C-alpha cells in the first residue's frame, strides 16, 4: 500500500470512509480495530495537511486590486 502522505486526497478520504464504516459495524477484532484506528488517524492527518496546503494556495491566488486578500473559506462556504 502507498504511504499515507503520498495518496491523493480523494483516495485518502475513500480509505478513511471505508475504515470508519468497518469500525462502526463493530465486527472487527480488537487488535485489528486498533490498527485500523491508527491508520484512520494517519489518513485524517494527511487529509488535514493537504487541505491546509490548498487553503494557503487559494489565499495566495485570491487578489483584489493587486493586493493579497485573506479569505475566510469557512464563512464563504456558508454564504
From Swiss-Prot:
Task: State one molecular function term (GO).
Answer: exodeoxyribonuclease VII activity
Offer one Pfam family short name for this entry: Exonuc_VII_S
EC category name: hydrolase
Question: Has UniProt tagged this entry with the keyword Cytoplasm?
Answer: yes
**Enzyme Commission designation:** 3.1.11.6
Family according to the record: Belongs to the XseB family.
What name goes with this protein?
A: Exodeoxyribonuclease 7 small subunit
> What is the scientific name of the source organism?
Shouchella clausii (strain KSM-K16) (Alkalihalobacillus clausii)
Question: What gene is this protein translated from?
Answer: xseB
